[in-house]
Amino acid sequence: MSSQIQSVHTPSVSLSKYRDQHFKGSRHEQEKLLRVSSTLYVGNLSFYTTEEQIHELFSRCGDVRRIIMGLDKFKKTPCGFCFVEYYSRLDAESAMRYINGTRLDDRIVRVDWDAGFIEGRQYGRGKTGGQVRDEYRQDHDLGRGGYGKMVQMGQLGAPSMRE
């Protein structure tokens, strides 16, 4: 009977292939934590999305314990991600199933399992303080501060307009 219950997992709540490269522990320990975690990583947020908006959306799937906004490590301003902790794994699974891939603030959000929030992880890991993915981005994205940081600093050229 228990083997039938274990096979109920759908791909939408399965573990992704992504693993936090800064995890303090072995790959096996990280896998073990991911399987029981009730913490989610939420990415591709607008820099202007508020904690209240996130709470309103994610509380539709269950009781939210806390939300930790991702911050630029130098400016302490939102930088496009957060962690959402639920009281139960089942509520977190509901969020994975129903919220991943939906729109919030005109952006398609990515929701993934997280091994659990540790103080310090709320800060962006990019050289300029934000997320690494925003450093070299050459497209103009108003929801994420315009061009990527390297373009804004003149270290990469902005894409030219073709006629």
Curated annotation (Swiss-Prot):
<dbReference type="GO" id="GO:0000339">
    <property type="term" value="F:RNA cap binding"/>
</dbReference>
<feature type="binding site">
    <location>
        <position position="18"/>
    </location>
    <ligand>
        <name>mRNA</name>
    </ligand>
</feature>
<dbReference type="InterPro" id="IPR034148">
    <property type="entry name" value="NCBP2_RRM"/>
</dbReference>
<feature type="binding site">
    <location>
        <begin position="110"/>
        <end position="114"/>
    </location>
    <ligand>
        <name>mRNA</name>
    </ligand>
</feature>
<feature type="domain" description="RRM">
    <location>
        <begin position="38"/>
        <end position="116"/>
    </location>
</feature>
<feature type="binding site">
    <location>
        <begin position="121"/>
        <end position="125"/>
    </location>
    <ligand>
        <name>mRNA</name>
    </ligand>
</feature>
<keyword id="KW-0943">RNA-mediated gene silencing</keyword>
<dbReference type="GO" id="GO:0045292">
    <property type="term" value="P:mRNA cis splicing, via spliceosome"/>
</dbReference>
<dbReference type="GO" id="GO:0005634">
    <property type="term" value="C:nucleus"/>
</dbReference>
<dbReference type="InterPro" id="IPR012677">
    <property type="entry name" value="Nucleotide-bd_a/b_plait_sf"/>
</dbReference>
<dbReference type="InterPro" id="IPR000504">
    <property type="entry name" value="RRM_dom"/>
</dbReference>
<comment type="function">
    <text>Component of the cap-binding complex (CBC), which binds co-transcriptionally to the 5' cap of pre-mRNAs and is involved in various processes such as pre-mRNA splicing and RNA-mediated gene silencing (RNAi). The CBC complex is involved in miRNA-mediated RNA interference and is required for primary microRNAs (miRNAs) processing. Also involved in innate immunity via the short interfering RNAs (siRNAs) processing machinery by restricting the viral RNA production.</text>
</comment>
<keyword id="KW-0694">RNA-binding</keyword>
<dbReference type="InterPro" id="IPR027157">
    <property type="entry name" value="NCBP2"/>
</dbReference>
<feature type="binding site">
    <location>
        <begin position="131"/>
        <end position="132"/>
    </location>
    <ligand>
        <name>mRNA</name>
    </ligand>
</feature>
<dbReference type="GO" id="GO:0005846">
    <property type="term" value="C:nuclear cap binding complex"/>
</dbReference>
<keyword id="KW-0508">mRNA splicing</keyword>
<protein>
    <recommendedName>
        <fullName>Nuclear cap-binding protein subunit 2</fullName>
    </recommendedName>
</protein>
<dbReference type="Pfam" id="PF00076">
    <property type="entry name" value="RRM_1"/>
</dbReference>
<dbReference type="InterPro" id="IPR035979">
    <property type="entry name" value="RBD_domain_sf"/>
</dbReference>
<dbReference type="GO" id="GO:0031047">
    <property type="term" value="P:regulatory ncRNA-mediated gene silencing"/>
</dbReference>
<dbReference type="GO" id="GO:0000398">
    <property type="term" value="P:mRNA splicing, via spliceosome"/>
</dbReference>
<feature type="binding site">
    <location>
        <position position="41"/>
    </location>
    <ligand>
        <name>mRNA</name>
    </ligand>
</feature>
<comment type="subunit">
    <text>Component of the nuclear cap-binding complex (CBC), a heterodimer composed of Cbp80 and Cbp20 that interacts with m7GpppG-capped RNA.</text>
</comment>
<comment type="similarity">
    <text>Belongs to the RRM NCBP2 family.</text>
</comment>
<keyword id="KW-0507">mRNA processing</keyword>
<keyword id="KW-0539">Nucleus</keyword>
